[in-house]
Amino acid sequence: FGDSVLYKADSSEYLIKTAEQHIEGDITITEVKDLIDSYYESKGVRLDVEHEGTEEADKVAARITEILSEKSFSFTPDFLIRIHQRLFCGVYGHAGQIRQRNISKKEWILDGDTVTYSGYDMIRQTLDYDFSQEKGTDYPSMSADQAIKRICKFVSGIWQIHPFAEGNTRTTAVFTMKYLQTFGFKPDNTIFRD
């Protein structure tokens, strides 16, 4: 959980306690996911669930930790879509599906400004183009500063496409962390906080 994109303000006390057990090595990530699922399956009969918003945060945080702990990675739009499906299965009815309508949203990360996202009918083509451009990047010939700028440009482009109706920022963050791992980096959520 130390590597997950986890915001304690959005998470339940139950998740935090369960995460501590995982960090201490007392339980596996599979056990964490099972415990979180059981916790919310029985929430209707319990009075100690803090508020409705924690279920999504808790389930997704556990799934992020699981995905980041896996060695597998494929530099493809399909892998990005699969991350979205795994993060939000059972949370959103559209998990793992490219959005089917145009959207605009005020983004907290931009102090409430809006962004022009890719048109829904061009999402797949735009993803394919951005991924093909990134695949052709010759990182060994770049300085560290050039490489960082190039990766940032690629990641911000994927985010601006906004391929999903919801969950784009977390999906892009997890994909980015997996991608950076292929370069030998061990990123954690602090790179997304500042």
Identify the role of each PLM range.
Residues 1-194:
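FIC/Doc superfamily catalytic core
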